[in-house]
């Protein structure tokens, strides 16, 4: 995966944790590969109950590791079979506090029931929690964004970035959001989670797919792809804040995921 990313001119990859144990594996991957950096966190759909004191202590310890550059992946998920919403709110709050302690930007997941682009319960819950924690000053991004412009603008108003993935290639409603998002707030990603539902392993989403998203974004915004490469690299480094130092030393100006 890393070799294919390098061949596609992706300069660096952030691999996210979705459980405490998975976060440890993300750190191991970052230590093993110089182009890989880690995020730590518990994903809302991986909750089996409220975060325990042990969970938060473990995440606190992991968040202080030098290879960790973001609190990820945390969030709110309101699908029918998602875990209890109170558990999710508690986990989101606890992980935001850990992020603040360690100066980590937030990479957060928001998913509505039935992937309804006009639904808003998950978004409203996330916005409320972010405002309550004054989390905008931490920086971060609404990751794998799939909402309408009116929804994106609410996260932008708090100071967050908007991250576009391969869904931009297949969801026309996202194009308005991609056009209107300020140039200094756009990020690119692939959200390369395991995809066993795809029978052909070669079709799994990977960091190597970033150039395709960049090309689509360039077409939607009416600019050249070199401009998209430049601004999204600058934006990623800006989003990382103080954690950008270790990435900046590696990444060339036109390459980053």
Regions found by a protein language model. Give the residues of each.
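Mid-domain alpha/beta scaffold segments of enzyme catalytic cores
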Residues: 1-257
